[in-house]
Amino acid sequence: MEPGPEDLKIITLARSARARVAAAEGAAVRDETGRTYAAAAVALPSLKLSALRLAVAMAVSSGASSLEAAALVSDAETVDP
């Protein structure tokens, strides 16, 4: 199954978030209203947060009550949850 235009949009947002800061991961989510949120992983010596967790936190803190899609991009073959 090919991703639709809205799914391609969040994949592009996830790639852009990752590239912007040269992060290991980039993620984007779409909420029930169609709003999108993108984030890159944080990997500091004192703090590590996955890109997907950050994108979800951004959506929830902006008032999203449900998510309809998520995209995670990385060079890795596996991703830690």
Regions found by a protein language model. Give the residues of each.
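C-terminal binding/interaction regions
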Residues: M1-R20, S62-P81
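A short, polar/charged loop-to-alpha-helix boundary motif
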Residues: L44-M58
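Short, small/polar residue-rich loop motifs at catalytic or cofactor-binding pockets
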Residues: V21-E25
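Short beta-strand scaffold segments in enzyme catalytic cores
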Residues: G26-R35
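Residues at the start of alpha-helices and the adjacent loop-to-helix junctions
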Residues: E6-K9, G26, L47, A51
